[in-house]
Every structure is written in structure tokens, then in C-alpha cells.
Amino acid sequence: LSVDGRSITGANIIIATGSSVFMPPFLALEGENHLLTSTEALDLDQVPASVTVIGGGVIGVEFAYLLNRLGSKVTVLELMDHILPMVDIEVSRLAEKRMTKDGILFRLGAKVSRVKDDTVYYEFGGQNCQVKSDMVLMAVGRVPNTQGLNAEGIGIEFDRKAIRTDAHMRTNIPHIYAIGDVNGKVMLAHTASHEGMVAVADICGQGE
């Protein structure tokens, strides 16, 4: 492993470089003054009066719930026909019903086409629609941080943009492991913590 011209060696290597927010370029270009990522939203000095959340996955729903509780008027735009696509549909429907009761507006099956300043343009139910808000939160997903690793150069295999691993977090190169968002399995902090323990247990001979 080479870092800033310095070589580091080890019997085993664990890659844990995480992920970054996926930001569609055409959206960021016109809405950069109002368009925020979940990381940037955590640094807000005050609660916005209104928020449009693009994406109804874990991060989008989490922030929609939080901001609604803090007093924001929240609209969630989701391309699929239900929120939280990684959970059972019954759980998804219950969460949507409860959050709708709390005042959150969901637009399911909405296809966002453009973000310009404080306005989000989208297609919904065969019509062109738009919604204005003080803040637009981009939460359509994350991408593994693999740039600069030269992983392909040493023969590490990928599953799309994520590093492929087995149940023990091993890559196809036995002494190299990948944990957390970079392996693309489940992009949640507690999952990364567990995967770290799995990898260390395997390195210590306790993998079974």
C-alpha cells in the first residue's frame, strides 16, 4: 500500500473507504444554491420552513421524518411506487401511512427532471409538476469510494461499482478485505461495524 509516497505493508489489508452521495450532474448544476446532501443538511444552522426530499430510501425517509418533527413542511419525491424499497412492502406501507398522517407529502412514481434554484420539476401521474421549497435534499443513493485505490490494477473484482466480497468480507484476493459501503452490500453504519468484526474474526482464524 502506497500513501503519499510512503509504502505500508501488512499480512492483511482491510479496505473501508466508505461511500459518497450520488449527485446527478444535471441536477447539481442548476440547483446548487438550494441543493444539499445529507452530510450538508446536518450542518444547517436553522430549520428550513419547507423541504423537498428527492429519494425515498433510508436516508431520504430518515431526514423527512426528522425535519417534519422539527417543523418543516416536507415533500418526498420517489421514483418507485413505494418508499424504503429494501424492506418488506408491509413495513414500507405502514411507514408511509404513519408519516403521511404526520403531515409529510409523498409523491410516489415521481420522475425528477430538473432542479433550478428553489424549484424541483418532475413528472407525476402523466403531468408535469413542480414544487418550491427553501431546501432540496438529494437522497437518491450513494456510490462506493473506490477511486484512487487502483483496485482493478491489482486484480480485485468488482460488482458494478462496489468491491465484491464473500460472507467473510474477503475479496477475490484472500488477504484483502472490504467492509462497509465500499462493498455495496448494505450501506448503513451499523452494518459496516458488524462487517469489520467479521473481517477481523476471519483474519484471526475465528471466521467459522
Regions found by a protein language model. Give the residues of each.
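A general beta-strand register signal
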Residues: S2, R107, Y121-E123, E157, ...
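Glycine/serine-rich phosphate-binding loop and adjoining beta1-alpha1 elements at the start
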Residues: S2-H34, S50
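Short loop/edge segments at beta-strand edges and connector loops
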Residues: V3, T17, T37-T39, L108-A110, ...
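Core beta-strand elements of the Rossmann-like FAD/NAD(P) dinucleotide-binding domain
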Residues: V3-N12, G126-M135, N172
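Short glycine-rich hinge loops at helix-strand junctions in the catalytic core
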Residues: G18, G71, K101-G103, G155, ...
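Short glycine-/small-residue-rich Rossmann-like dinucleotide-binding loops
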Residues: G18-S19, F124, L137, G141-R142
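FAD-site-proximal beta/loop scaffold in flavoenzymes
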Residues: E30-V47, Q130-G207
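Rossmann-like dinucleotide-binding cores of NAD(P)H-dependent redox enzymes
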Residues: L42-D43, P48-T52, V58-N128, K185-S193, ...
